[in-house]
């Protein structure tokens, strides 16, 4: 955990220097499919760093550290509308192509690209896993004992950002992204259980195709403080926002 925090602090310092034109503060949240509402670990998030290829096209990246309350696990026999993994910490690093449509008063950015993510300090949600097993086997009682193999994940995303100026130095940004990603999470172990007044049984499992489902909606609202020097064209894109 200390190494992750140090890496983010170093990235934050470098990114702040690189994005000296515009810096800001925003609050970002992630709503996963069949998961639980998640929040960022402030201030370990900065997004919108990149290079303007021309007036209309830019390449952007960044990094965010999320506290995931719960995520779904897919590609197993266990079916659940609730989170089976979490809580954990997740590092998210996007890379995106941005189409910049600037009007006289507002700017609309259209974004699409891919992302890398990695969850650490993982915990299986045995309460929901046991309930999924009971539903699968039609049992009254179930108790799972599983181990997992953690892996990084990848996916794609698309979204839009609306930037509205209030003055030469202050803007407000509203951003929404839809993310679709998975990370391999093979599960091994066993589960035991049965019905009342019946002998219990133990079943070995090997869910080698299990994956973390990182699909959901990310949205943020923030303030951007401009240095007032509206440099254009190629160069480092000055839109870094610390979330």
Identify the meaning behind each predicted range.
Residues 125-146, 187-207:
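Solvent-exposed, glycine/polar-rich loop segments of beta-barrel outer-membrane systems
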Residues 141-165:
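A contiguous pocket-lining binding segment that forms or flanks enzyme active sites
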Residues 38-42, 85-91, 146-155, 209-215:
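Short sequence motifs at beta-strands and strand-loop junctions characteristic
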